[in-house]
Swiss-Prot record:
Family: Belongs to the mitochondrial carrier (TC 2.A.29) family.
InterPro entries the record matches: Mito_Metabolite_Transporter, Mitochondrial_sb/sol_carrier, Mt_carrier_dom_sf
Entry keyword annotation includes Protein biosynthesis: no
Gene3D superfamilies: Mitochondrial carrier domain
Protein name per UniProt: Macronuclear solute carrier homolog CR-MSC
Protein localization: Membrane
One protein family per Pfam: Mito_carr
Length: 371
C-alpha cells in the first residue's frame, strides 16, 4: 500500500505542459483577457500619446486620463468590438502568448524543481520565470507587433494608417518590412520580469498574512495586489520600450527613430524624463493605471477559475503541497502532503457537519464540537 507522500509524488510528477494544462490555461486566459481587453487598449494608447512629451506629475499622462481615453474610444463608434481591434488577432495572440509562457516556464521549472511535491526555492523560481518568460516573449513577438499596430492605428491620420484587416495580412506586411522580431528583446524582458517577480511575492504575502488572518479571502486579495504592483513597476518600462519599437515609423529622412532597445531607453530618459523640463521617470509608466488594473484582474480572476476547474469550491491551494509552518517559519525539510485548507475541510466535515463523527460521541447522536 503506497504512502500518501508516494501518491502525491506520482500524481504530481509531471510538471511540464500537457494537453490538460494547454486546454485549461488557454480557456482561462481567453476568459480573463477578453474581460480586460479594453484596459489594454487604454494602456497602449496612453503610451503612444506620451511619446515625445515630458511627464510632470504621477498618476496621469499629460491630462489623458484612462477613463477619458476609454470614453473617447467608445464614442468614436463601433461599440465594444472596437476595443478588440480584430477578434482573430486577439485569439491568436492570447493563445500563443499563454501556450508559450506556460510551456517555457513549465520546462525550466521542471528542471530546477526535482521533487514535484514541493515548491521550488525562490531563487530557482525566479530563474525559471526569467528564462521561460524571455523565451515566450521572443517567440510571440511577431503576433504582438501585429496586434499592437492594430490597436493604435486610429491615432494616425487616415493616409498614414496601416489598415491590417486580419492576422495573416498583418504578419505578411510585417515580414515585408523585415520587422517580425523588432522589439523582441524588450518583449522578452517584459514577460521575464512579470513571471519572475510576482509568484514569490504573492507566496510570501499570503504565507505571512495567514498567520494573522487564518484561511481568509483577504490573503488572496492583498497578496495579489502587492505582487501585481511590484510586477507593474519592474515590467512596465520594458513594455513602454516594446510599444515604441513595435509601432515606430520611418522619419522624414528615412531613418527609424530608434535603433534598438537600448537606444529607445536612452532617448526616453534624455527627452522625456529630464528634470530640466519638470519631468521624471514616470514617463515609462504612462498608462500605468490601466496596466496595473488589467494585470490585477487577470491574476485575481484566474485564481477563482482555477479553483472552479479543480473543483476546490474556493478553498485556497486545496491540494497544493504545504511548505510553510506557521509556528516556526519556512522549512523545506518538513513536508505535509495535506494543506491547511484540506485539513480544515476534514475538520469541518467530520467533526462538526451533520453525520460526521457523531457515532464517536458518548450519546451516539450528537456531533463533536470544536471549542
Amino acid at each position: 500500500m503506497p504512502t500518501q507522500m508516494e501518491v502525491e509524488y506520482w500524481r504530481r510528477r509531471y510538471q511540464r505542459m500537457n494537453y490538460e494544462r494547454f486546454a485549461a490555461a488557454n480557456v482561462i486566459a481567453l476568459i480573463t483577457h477578453a474581460a480586460t481587453q479594453p484596459l489594454d487598449m487604454v494602456r497602449i494608447r496612453s503610451q503612444m500619446l506620451q511619446e515625445g512629451k515630458t511627464f510632470s506629475g504621477l498618476g496621469y499622462q499629460k491630462g489623458w486620463y484612462p477613463f477619458q481615453i476609454m470614453e473617447e474610444i467608445y464614442a468614436a463608434g463601433g461599440g465594444l468590438r472596437k476595443f478588440y481591434s480584430a477578434f482573430d488577432t486577439f485569439f491568436f495572440r492570447t493563445v500563443g502568448y499563454t501556450t508559450a509562457r506556460v510551456t517555457a516556464f513549465g520546462y525550466f521549472y521542471d528542471k530546477v524543481n526535482k521533487d514535484p511535491r514541493r515548491v521550488a526555492r525562490p531563487d530557482f523560481l525566479v530563474a525559471a520565470g526569467v528564462l521561460g518568460g524571455f523565451i515566450a516573449g521572443v517567440v510571440t513577438n511577431p503576433i504582438d507587433i501585429v496586434y499592437n499596430r492594430m490597436q493604435v492605428d486610429e491615432l494616425y491620420p487616415q493616409a498614414a494608417r496601416r489598415n491590417y484587416s486580419n492576422t495573416v495580412q498583418g504578419l505578411a506586411k510585417v515580414a515585408e518590412e523585415g520587422a517580425l522580431f523588432r522589439g523582441a528583446g524588450a518583449n522578452g524582458f517584459k514577460l521575464a520580469a512579470i513571471c519572475s517577480s510576482m509568484t514569490n511575492i504573492y507566496d510570501w504575502c499570503k504565507e505571512n498574512s495567514y498567520f494573522f488572518f487564518g484561511p481568509h479571502w483577504i490573503n488572496r486579495l492583498w497578496g495579489t495586489a502587492v505582487a501585481v504592483a511590484i510586477g507593474t513597476v519592474v515590467s512596465m518600462p520594458f513594455d513602454m520600450i516594446r510599444t515604441r519599437l513595435h509601432t515606430m515609423r520611418p522619419l522624414p529622412n528615412g531613418q527609424m527613430p530608434y535603433n534598438g532597445m537600448f537606444d529607445c531607453f536612452n532617448k526616453i530618459i534624455k527627452y522625456e524624463c529630464n528634470s530640466k523640463w519638470m519631468s521624471n521617470f514616470g514617463s515609462f509608466y504612462a498608462g500605468g493605471e490601466a496596466y496595473f488594473l488589467r494585470l490585477f484582474l487577470i491574476c485575481y480572476l484566474s485564481q477563482f477559475l482555477v479553483d472552479y476547474y479543480n473543483e476546490n469550491y474556493y478553498d485556497q491551494e486545496f491540494w497544493q503541497p504545504q511548505r510553510f509552518h506557521y509556528q516556526s517559519g519556512i522549512d523545506y525539510d518538513i513536508h505535509d502532503p495535506y494543506t491547511d485548507a484540506f485539513n480544515k475541510k476534514l475538520v469541518a466535515t467530520y467533526t462538526t457537519a451533520a453525520g460526521g463523527m457523531g457515532a464517536a460521541h458518548p450519546s451516539g447522536k450528537d456531533n463533536l464540537a470544536i471549542i
